[in-house]
Amino acid sequence: MSKDATLPVRGTVAELKLEKKLPKKIDAIIVAIFEGEDSIELAGGEILDFIFSTEQQADILTQLEAVGAKATANSITRVPGTDVAPVIAVGLGKADLLDDETLRRASGTAARSLGGFENVATTIGDLGLAAAVTGFGLGSYSYAGLRKETEESKDKTTTVTFISTGKDDKDVFVEAQIIVESVLLARDLVNTPSSHLYPESYSVIASNEASKHGLQTTILDEKQLADQGFGGILAVGNGSSRKPRLLRIDWKPRKAKKSIALVGKGITFDTGGISIKPGASMENMISDMGGSASVLATIIAAARLNLSINVSAFLPMAENMPSGDAFRPGDVITHFGGITSEILNTDAEGRLILADAIAYASEDKPDYLIDAATLTGAQLVALGLRTSGVMGTDEFRDSVAKTGREVGEQAWAMPLPEELDEQVKSPVADLRNVTNSRFAGMSAAGRYLQEFVGADIEWAHVDIAGPAYNTAGEFGYTPKRATGQPVRTFVQVLKDLSES
């Protein structure tokens, strides 16, 4: 058993509550404002009127106009408010352009402005409770890591109360909270340094998290991986003294008719191996297990939401290190299932461990299979820091990409051009792990993985190299470092499949 069997630290987050009336102790009330034709307008309906009288609303608007408040999306303005409490106004832009993502981002921005407040209430849920809860929950996240704590550095938990007037509000609130908590789990895992999160410890931590929710787990160690022929995972992981693992997790509800396999890349640190990466920014490679973290979080959410779909998650875990035991360019490895692959670049290791896990998952003959990976720099070149690339069988690929855009996790469908068929072939093996071309690197990786997907399985490969880890500034409900993408996309895909 690994000594690191639990996460060393978790991020802090606001405590969200749903109440039918305003709490007695309140430090501020967060309201939303729209851009009107000539002036700003308070945004809301029943809940706004429930808390503030017509005269109080007019007074708040007067105060906001007096300080030159703008209602552009994500703007924040503080005013004295009323005798109820001071007011924090967050802008939503024009009312006719409001959508869930605008509301999520504004709520996240508001959540990040609450330093110094212990108890706040908000009327923003009046405009879309699920989106507001998601924005506040994700936006309030802060990760201090392993810094020595002082009284000044202690994060004081803020309580955010949503006022409820609808009969279905509790169900909406609880579901949104579960999804938020799942995203936060993925963030915590990705933010954990590789000194504390490595294949053995990660497999135990993930298994423990899944077991809390009644999920069945199985861990294969390096000996079992060798006995069963997982040549890709072993090739990548054997260069490290921290040996590889493969974790399987199952959610099997009664009467479920459909099945899906989730596969996530779990490289706990990536040096590039013998094809070593440049030293600059290599510390960000703690995030190279982001795909596996999202898969773990998704199957836990499926269990907590009691989704009626059979879900099996596969998390191949390895540390890609250079050593005398590391695999080399020119090696030929044999994947699970027998396909051989020539290694041209040891820094194209993610597809090797995914290939084993996809072939293994395909033996169950699931109806659908999704894999997620921080896989290629080519994704960043093609789509940038915030948009995932989705490849796979046409209809399912398009559906997953569309779902991502709907929940606010930007995604774009990408092709697997037929000319790549010859480029992924090797003269000395069935495949080569990279092509000899610098073009279409993201699609080439997807084309490699396609070889391992079983027949008649609807498949989507999601490259999250940029979106999984935010190296730029925080925005909306997205913090620096781990983002938790694409957990919300995957949970919604599972919900849609379970209900269809």
Curated annotation (Swiss-Prot):
Chief place where the protein resides: cytoplasm
Keywords, in A-Z order: Aminopeptidase, Cytoplasm, Hydrolase, Manganese, Metal-binding, Protease
Cofactor: Mn(2+)
The keyword Iron belongs to this UniProt entry's keyword annotation: no
Binding site for Mn(2+) 2: K265, D270, D288, E349
UniProt subcellular location: Cytoplasm
Cofactor binding mode and count: Binds 2 manganese ions per subunit.
Enzyme Commission number, as recorded: 3.4.11.1, 3.4.11.10
HAMAP family for the chain: Cytosol_peptidase_M17
Family to which this protein belongs: Belongs to the peptidase M17 family.
Main function: Presumably involved in the processing and regular turnover of intracellular proteins. Catalyzes the removal of unsubstituted N-terminal amino acids from various peptides.
Protein name: Probable cytosol aminopeptidase
Native source organism of the sequence: Corynebacterium glutamicum (strain ATCC 13032 / DSM 20300 / JCM 1318 / BCRC 11384 / CCUG 27702 / LMG 3730 / NBRC 12168 / NCIMB 10025 / NRRL B-2784 / 534)
Source species taxonomy: Bacteria, Bacillati, Actinomycetota, Actinomycetes, Mycobacteriales
